[in-house]
Protein backbone atom coordinates (compact mmCIF):
# COMPACT_ATOMS: atom_id res chain seq x y z
CA UNK A 1 0.00 0.00 0.00
CA UNK A 2 0.97 3.57 -0.58
CA UNK A 3 1.73 5.56 2.52
CA UNK A 4 -0.22 8.79 2.41
CA UNK A 5 1.27 11.26 4.82
CA UNK A 6 0.37 14.91 4.79
CA UNK A 7 3.42 17.10 4.81
CA UNK A 8 3.05 20.69 5.83
CA UNK A 9 5.30 22.76 3.62
CA UNK A 10 5.62 25.73 5.97
CA UNK A 11 6.43 23.50 8.90
CA UNK A 12 9.01 21.58 6.89
CA UNK A 13 10.67 24.78 5.72
CA UNK A 14 10.72 26.15 9.26
CA UNK A 15 12.26 22.96 10.65
CA UNK A 16 14.84 22.89 7.86
CA UNK A 17 15.83 26.51 8.52
CA UNK A 18 16.12 25.90 12.26
CA UNK A 19 18.12 22.70 11.85
CA UNK A 20 20.37 23.44 8.89
CA UNK A 21 20.19 27.10 7.96
CA UNK A 22 20.73 29.16 11.07
CA UNK A 23 23.54 31.25 9.61
CA UNK A 24 21.75 32.08 6.32
CA UNK A 25 18.58 32.93 8.26
CA UNK A 26 20.55 35.18 10.58
CA UNK A 27 22.24 36.85 7.61
CA UNK A 28 18.87 37.35 5.91
CA UNK A 29 17.48 39.03 9.01
CA UNK A 30 20.59 41.22 9.27
CA UNK A 31 20.32 42.28 5.61
CA UNK A 32 16.62 43.09 5.97
CA UNK A 33 17.22 45.11 9.13
CA UNK A 34 20.12 46.96 7.52
CA UNK A 35 18.15 47.81 4.39
CA UNK A 36 15.22 49.01 6.50
CA UNK A 37 17.53 51.30 8.47
CA UNK A 38 19.00 52.69 5.24
CA UNK A 39 15.52 53.53 3.97
CA UNK A 40 14.54 55.16 7.27
CA UNK A 41 17.77 57.17 7.44
CA UNK A 42 17.39 58.36 3.84
CA UNK A 43 13.81 59.46 4.50
CA UNK A 44 14.77 61.35 7.66
CA UNK A 45 17.70 63.02 5.89
CA UNK A 46 15.46 64.25 3.08
CA UNK A 47 12.81 65.46 5.52
CA UNK A 48 15.37 67.34 7.61
CA UNK A 49 16.93 68.87 4.49
CA UNK A 50 13.54 70.21 3.39
CA UNK A 51 12.88 71.53 6.91
CA UNK A 52 16.29 73.25 6.95
CA UNK A 53 15.60 74.93 3.62
CA UNK A 54 12.25 76.18 4.89
CA UNK A 55 13.88 77.56 8.02
CA UNK A 56 16.55 79.33 5.96
CA UNK A 57 13.84 80.94 3.81
CA UNK A 58 11.98 82.04 6.93
CA UNK A 59 15.22 83.44 8.37
CA UNK A 60 15.80 85.47 5.21
CA UNK A 61 12.26 86.87 5.33
CA UNK A 62 12.63 87.80 9.00
CA UNK A 63 16.04 89.37 8.34
CA UNK A 64 14.57 91.56 5.59
CA UNK A 65 11.69 92.56 7.87
CA UNK A 66 14.17 93.39 10.66
CA UNK A 67 16.20 95.62 8.34
CA UNK A 68 13.04 97.40 7.21
CA UNK A 69 12.03 97.99 10.83
CA UNK A 70 15.46 99.43 11.62
CA UNK A 71 15.16 101.79 8.65
CA UNK A 72 11.66 102.79 9.72
CA UNK A 73 12.86 103.44 13.26
CA UNK A 74 15.71 105.61 11.96
CA UNK A 75 13.32 107.63 9.79
CA UNK A 76 10.91 108.17 12.69
CA UNK A 77 13.70 109.20 15.06
CA UNK A 78 15.10 111.63 12.44
CA UNK A 79 11.66 113.20 12.01
CA UNK A 80 11.24 113.51 15.76
CA UNK A 81 14.64 115.17 16.03
CA UNK A 82 13.78 117.61 13.24
CA UNK A 83 10.48 118.46 14.93
CA UNK A 84 12.28 119.00 18.23
CA UNK A 85 14.88 121.30 16.63
CA UNK A 86 12.16 123.20 14.75
CA UNK A 87 10.12 123.82 17.89
CA UNK A 88 13.23 124.95 19.79
CA UNK A 89 14.06 127.56 17.18
Swiss-Prot record:
A GO cellular-component term linked to this record: cell division site
Similarity remark: Belongs to the FtsL family.
UniProt xrefs under InterPro entries: Cell_div_FtsL (IPR011922)
Cytoplasmic face residues: 1-22
Keyword annotations from UniProtKB, A to Z: Cell cycle, Cell division, Cell inner membrane, Cell membrane, Membrane, Transmembrane, Transmembrane helix
Quaternary data: Part of a complex composed of FtsB, FtsL and FtsQ.
Keyword Cell division part of the UniProt annotation: yes
Pfam families noted in UniProt: FtsL
Role description: Essential cell division protein. May link together the upstream cell division proteins, which are predominantly cytoplasmic, with the downstream cell division proteins, which are predominantly periplasmic.
Gene: ftsL
Name of protein: Cell division protein FtsL
Subcellular location: Cell inner membrane
Residues on Periplasmic side: 41-89
Entry annotated with the keyword Cell cycle: yes
Amino acid sequence: MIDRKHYHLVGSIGKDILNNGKLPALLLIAVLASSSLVVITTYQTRRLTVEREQLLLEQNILDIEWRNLILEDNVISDQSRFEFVATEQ
